[in-house]
C-alpha cells in the first residue's frame, strides 16, 4: 500500500532525504496523534520533521486514509459542506504575451473559464513592476479588470493578484482599487509585500471609501505564527493564503481556525499541482473556515484521479479512502521511474 503526495517547488535534495530516514519502518498510525479515529496532531517523535516538511501530510494522510478506509478529509473532522467551490487561478498575462490581441486576450480566457463552469476567476495584475512601464502597467491592470467585468456580468467573482507588483508603490495600489471600484473586485492579493503598516493603511482607505474589496495574502508564509500580527488586535488580512503544500493539512487547519476567530477565512494558495488542488478540497470539506479552493487546472499524466468531480463551479469528493488518487504504473515506469529517488 502506498501514500501519494507532492513536494514543494524545488527538487528534493540528498540532505532532505536523509532527514526523512526516521520515517522508514515507522507505523503510519503512530506518526500523528490519533484520537477517535482522527488525526489530532503530530506525534512528539515526528513533530519537528512534520513541521519542517509539512507537505508530507499529503502522502501520509493518503496512506493513513487507505489503511483506515477513510477519505483524507474524514481524518480531520466531520464534513461541513457537500460541494466545495473552486475559483480559476490560471488567468495570467495573455495581453502581454499576445500583445497584438491586447486586453481581449484575457477577456476571452475568462469567458472560456466561465463556460467551463467557474464562478470565480483570479486575474494576474502588477504589469507595471516589470512587464510594462509603471503608469502604462497600472492603466492596463485597470482596463483588464473592467473589461472582464463588462464581459462576464455581475454574477462572477473577480479577484486580482499583482504578485507584489505594487511594491514600494502604495499610491499605485490605491489607484488600482479606485480604478476598478465599479467592477467590485472581490479581493486584492499581494498588492505589495505584506506589512502591518501597509495593510493598516490599505484597510483604512478601503473602509473610508466604502469599498467591499477584501485583502488576501500569505502564500509565502510557512506556518501560522507569522500571520498572527495580521489577525490581532485587528484583522488586516481577510483571506489568508498559506500554500496548501507548504503548510500541509495540519498547519492550514490551524491557520483557518485563527482566521475564523478573527472574522476572516483561509483559502490556501496552490500553483502547478493537481495534488495541491485535491488536498485543498479535502481540507475545505472538513474545515468550516476554508470556504473555497484555488484551482490551477493542473493535470498529471501519471495520476489516476478517481475521487473528485467538477461541475458548475464546485467539486464533489467521492467516498474513497485517502486522497482518492493512484499511480498509473505503466506511465510511471515508462516516463518517470528512471529518475526516481528513494530514502534508504
Question: What kind of region is each of these model predictions?
Answer:
Residues 56, 69, 121, 161, ...:
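Conserved, mostly hydrophobic/aromatic
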Residues 56-97:
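Glycine-rich, aromatic-flanked loop segments that form ligand/cofactor-binding clefts
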Residues 83-84, 88-205:
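Metal-dependent enolase-superfamily TIM-barrel catalytic cores that perform enediolate-based chemistry
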Amino acid at each position: 500500500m502506498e501514500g501519494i503526495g507532492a513536494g514543494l517547488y524545488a527538487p528534493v535534495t540528498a540532505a532532505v532525504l536523509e532527514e526523512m530516514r526516521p520515517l522508514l519502518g515507522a507505523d503510519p498510525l503512530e506518526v500523528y496523534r490519533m484520537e477517535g479515529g482522527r488525526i489530532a496532531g503530530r506525534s512528539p517523535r515526528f513533530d519537528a520533521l512534520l513541521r519542517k516538511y509539512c507537505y508530507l501530510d499529503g502522502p501520509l494522510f493518503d496512506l493513513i486514509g487507505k489503511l483506515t478506509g477513510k477519505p483524507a478529509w474524514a481524518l480531520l473532522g466531520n464534513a461541513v459542506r457537500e460541494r466545495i467551490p473552486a475559483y480559476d487561478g490560471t488567468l495570467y498575462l495573455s495581453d502581454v504575451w499576445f500583445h497584438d490581441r491586447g486586453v481581449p486576450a484575457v477577456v476571452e480566457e475568462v469567458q472560456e473559464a466561465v463556460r467551463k463552469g467557474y464562478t470565480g476567476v483570479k486575474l494576474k495584475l502588477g504589469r507595471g513592476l516589470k512587464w510594462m512601464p509603471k503608469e502604462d502597467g497600472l492603466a492596463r491592470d485597470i482596463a483588464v479588470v473592467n473589461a472582464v467585468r463588462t464581459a462576464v456580468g455581475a454574477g462572477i467573482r473577480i479577484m486580482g493578484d499583482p504578485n507584489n507588483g505594487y511594491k514600494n508603490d502604495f499610491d499605485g495600489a490605491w489607484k488600482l482599487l479606485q480604478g476598478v471600484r465599479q467592477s467590485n473586485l472581490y479581493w486584492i492579493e499581494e498588492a505589495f509585500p505584506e506589512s502591518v503598516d501597509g495593510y493598516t493603511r490599505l484597510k483604512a482607505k478601503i473602509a473610508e471609501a466604502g469599498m467591499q474589496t477584501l485583502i488576501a495574502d500569505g502564500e509565502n508564509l510557512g506556518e501560522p505564527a507569522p500571520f498572527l500580527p495580521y489577525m490581532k488586535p485587528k484583522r488586516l488580512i481577510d483571506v489568508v493564503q498559506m500554500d496548501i503544500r507548504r503548510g500541509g493539512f495540519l498547519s492550514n487547519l490551524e491557520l483557518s481556525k485563527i482566521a475564523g476567530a478573527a472574522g476572516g477565512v483561509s483559502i490556501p494558495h496552490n500553483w502547478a499541482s493537481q495534488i495541491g488542488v485535491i488536498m485543498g478540497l479535502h481540507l475545505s470539506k472538513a474545515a468550516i473556515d476554508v470556504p473555497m479552493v484555488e484551482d490551477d487546472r493542473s493535470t498529471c499524466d501519471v495520476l489516476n484521479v478517481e475521487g473528485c468531480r467538477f461541475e458548475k463551479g464546485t467539486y464533489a469528493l467521492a467516498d474513497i479512502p485517502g486522497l482518492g488518487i493512484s499511480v498509473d504504473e505503466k506511465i510511471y515506469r515508462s516516463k518517470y521511474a528512471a529518475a526516481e529517488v528513494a530514502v534508504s
